[in-house]
Amino acid sequence: MTQDELKKAVGWAALQYVQPGTIVGVGTGSTAAHFIDALGTMKGQIEGAVSSSDASTEKLKSLGITVFDLNEVDRLGIYVDGADEINGHMQMIKGGGAALTREKIIASVADKFICIADASKQVDILGNFPLPVEVIPMARSAVARQLVKLGGRPEYRQGVVTDNGNVILDVHGLEILDAIALENAINAIPGVVTVGLFANRGADVALIGTADGVKTIVK
């Protein structure tokens, strides 16, 4: 199976967690896009979705799925999203698609975070994938200096502006042994909106696409 076929398999597998009559939290990226396609087959059974990016909102609406502002929603049963890396503790690096802040907000509200990923995203130690940090534009250089002190090598993601109007620094060279401590440390830097470490709020369920089928891991 190709990588895209593995992503499609886990996207469709996540449908089993969607309860009729509910509002579903939806992530961003190539794997989440397959979940949105799958969700389109249930559009008459769900109330709608909360979206983590303008791109996902556009796709949801194109399939006839109602998109709610998070402020209108009291609770979310599930949030379904991909990951750039996921470790054995169900901690993740996310933000390759620059939607990390909205993703983290929606994940924090949801009762259950379901991570959908192909097997190439599974790692023992996080950090080989550059760690994205969303930053207020005026603080870019100041934040970069602090990230160097934490042992990283930040690179400005040229030409990318987030849906929130901010910029992204991708931090290379990190071997993340204590993901919760690093998430807290980076989030404490003035000018950081959030870091793409999902450690304090990791995944509850991981659906991993493998050549032998979809593997389910429960926290």
From Swiss-Prot:
NCBIfam families: PRK00702.1, rpiA. The lineage of its organism: Bacteria, Pseudomonadati, Pseudomonadota, Gammaproteobacteria, Enterobacterales. Belongs to the ribose 5-phosphate isomerase family. Pathway: Carbohydrate degradation; pentose phosphate pathway; D-ribose 5-phosphate from D-ribulose 5-phosphate (non-oxidative stage): step 1/1. Catalyzes the reversible conversion of ribose-5-phosphate to ribulose 5-phosphate. The gene is rpiA. Gene3D superfamilies: 3.30.70.260, 3.40.50.1360. It comes from Enterobacter cloacae. It comes from the Bacteria. This is Ribose-5-phosphate isomerase A. The keyword Magnesium does not apply. Its EC number is 5.3.1.6.
